[in-house]
Amino acid sequence: MNQFKFKVEKEIYDSNLNGRTGVITTPHGEIKTPAFIPVGTKATVKSVLPESMSDLGAQALLANAYHLYLQPGPEIVDEAGGVGKFMNWSGPTFTDSGGFQVLSLGVGFKKVIAMDEDTFRSDEVIADQKERLAHVDNDGVTFKSHLDGSMHRFTPEVSMQVQHQLGADIIFAFDECTTLHNTRKYQEKSLERTRLWAKRCLVEHGRLTRERSSKPYQALWGVLQGAQYEDLRRKAAKDLSALDEDGITFDGFGLGGALDKANLGTIVGWMTDELPRDKPRHLLGIGEPDDLFVGVENGADTFDCVAPSRQARTSAVFTNSGRVNITNAKFNRDFNPIDESCDCYTCKNYTAAYLNHLFRSKEMIGSTLATIHNERFIVRLVERMRTEIESGDFQEFKKDF
């Protein structure tokens, strides 16, 4: 039984913007959108108890299929009752397809990834003297485990099988993630490959849904690529929206691939212009405050990113005045919360001076307290965006932030 639904509630009253609020209904609860989905890559948000994420306002968590496939293995997660039960999280869950991790590890990238290596050799893209761990062909990707060097093969079918075993409420189709530095010719070739992989994902998803009919319904979302090209982004949106394999269609869409920060809103707008209004859109890998504003106003409903927890572990914390490094000397005697307006556990109970001390002393709890703050800050920010859209004050809120 399909227990997945999406309802649009309120749209920004501006002909140039596509922002809206809504509700995603899954077998494990509702997600009020727009919403930020914290990332628990290996079925845990690093340094924070999974069950405590609900106290931070998280409505859902996202885990990574690639990492859970390698360790502990999807069959173990399946036997445990699915990724949510495995990590003691009762709310909705997402898993990504594993495509980004397989492909990015495949070229040993630094800041971005590049599959047509001969086209772009900057050391900002491909790390020097690093072994290529993956090979892409039209059928799938062969890759070497970063854990033990063993060889593996991901195809659209394998990605679906792994994600069905992981048991998340929302799963993503297997796609090829390109970069802004790939040639136009390669982008066209890759876009068609991703479209064909999407068709295969729908077929296998349908088969597995029937085969595992006693399990809660899993919603499959297609992933749009196309880099910085308007025609390719629009084509991807139209193509994936039109796919129908024996009545099986995508329940939502992921806006993926390389996104130029300077043109983020424009690129997201191209895709949301073409996507059906009644299906949710997830902007993959976006979590910086300014990018979230842009994503929301251009029609993205959910977001995920490792940035809040990753940056917290390096002593970087979000504030209403911008991101700061809590180890800076000016915080030595700052006996105020990290952010006076924040309602998180850390800001209610600890001072900036104490976190400064914890990080300088290399105490593990420093990462925990900083992660609690950062995750709550971003979750709450997107919550506030939802409230301001509903009240008609989103643009004023963005201007004042």
What are these model-derived regions, one by one?
Residues 1-213, 329-332:
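Non-catalytic, usually N-terminal nucleic-acid engagement modules in DNA/RNA processing proteins
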Residues 1-23, 31-35, 44-47, 174-182, ...:
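C-terminal extensions of enzymes
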Residues 29, 61, 96, 163, ...:
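Conserved, mostly hydrophobic/aromatic
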Residues 74-83, 312-326, 379-382:
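C-terminal helical cap(s) of enzyme catalytic domains, especially alpha/beta-barrels
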Residues 105-107, 337, 358:
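Short conserved micro-motifs at the rims of enzyme active sites and ligand-binding pockets
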Residues 158, 162, 166, 189-200, ...:
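A non-catalytic, amphipathic alpha-helix used as a structural packing/dimerization or gating element
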Residues 179-184, 188, 221, 251-256, ...:
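Glycine- and acidic
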Residues 192-195, 204, 208-210, 215-338:
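Glycine-rich phosphate/ribose-binding loops and adjacent secondary-structure elements
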